[in-house]
Regions:
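C-terminal structural segment of proteins
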Residues: 1-288
Length: 288
């Protein structure tokens, strides 16, 4: 792509006009994934719409209820406010690809790419995040849960882009853990990613939100597990065994170069066991 093929809007209005004028042009921010289609797959692209000059997409705001992250902000730029509010995501952030990639890659791109093995969607699902979708005329806010409709397919409508990601802040009763399993510690894609967000009141489960990657065609939650544990004593072994069985029944992962389906199912079971152990109040242990 020559310089004449890159469109760089600087405002919401310019971006909406660019999308309307070039509906086939892909939107790119850091281009850390899209760029591979050109350098490795030799894809011929006539026009791209770059979001790198859209300062309005790079803001990060914290309210009393939530953290609102601009979809076009590089991951390294948002790492500090994100980890300040959600320190449990440190492993995911620090192991996300590599430092040069994190200087370019954006949270919005990681979501819009709709990869089943993206690192951040499982965490955002478990945290109950919402997306701000803009078309230049109005912004609609939808839950991330349900946004992924199929393999690399989303609820984005014609002319829309992700402008921000809104994440509710945690309470003192939230117990969150994020686990990434990959062949390499750094610069690798998840074989399995699992994130759990558990709320306990007097040892009783009042809420459970989940997020998973690498086990289905899209980033997923496990609604059956989330509903089945409500009202149960977390310390009970029933929670452990019920969770293992429901996770086994919920997903049908595939065999690929990163892991076999059997391995992925076993890892899910092991991670649930680990999470259950780590959150036993009378037997607090560190497994990291």
């Amino acid at each position: 792509i020559g310089s004449s093929g890159v469109i760089m809007p600087t405002s919401r209005e310019e971006l909406a006009n660019a999308i309307q004028g070039y509906p086939a042009a892909p939107l790119v921010a850091g281009s850390t994934d899209f760029g591979l289609s050109i350098t490795q797959q030799l894809k011929n692209v006539e026009k791209v719409i770059s979001l790198s000059a859209m300062d309005s997409l790079k803001k990060c705001t914290k309210t009393e209820q939530s953290l609102i992250i601009g979809a076009g902000a590089p991951l390294n730029d948002i790492a500090s406010p994100l980890l300040s509010a959600f320190p449990q995501l440190a492993e995911l952030i620090t192991r996300f690809a590599s430092l040069p990639i994190r200087n370019q890659a954006t949270l919005g791109g990681n979501i819009a790419n709709a990869s089943p093995i993206g690192d951040m969607p499982p965490a955002l699902l478990a945290l109950g995040a919402s997306l701000h979708l803009d078309n230049g005329q109005q912004v609609r806010v939808i839950p991330l849960k349900g946004f992924f409709t199929g393999y690399r397919q989303t609820q984005l409508e014609k002319g829309e882009w992700i402008s921000a990601i809104e994440i509710p802040l945690l309470s003192k009763d939230n117990n969150v853990a994020a686990y990434k399993i990959s062949k390499r510690m750094e610069d690798d894609i998840s074989a399995v990613c699992a994130v759990f967000n558990l709320t306990l009141v007097d040892g009783v489960v009042t809420s459970l939100q989940t997020g998973f990657g690498g086990v289905a065609a899209t980033p997923e939650t496990c609604p059956t597990l989330e509903g089945a544990l409500i009202g149960k004593q977390w310390q009970s072994a029933d929670c452990l065994h019920l969770g293992k069985q429901m996770l086994k029944d919920a997903f049908n992962p595939i065999d690929d170069v990163r892991a076999s389906a059997a391995y992925r199912n076993q890892v899910l079971s092991n991670l649930w066991h680990r999470f259950w152990l780590e959150n036993q109040a009378n037997n607090a242990i560190e497994t990291r």
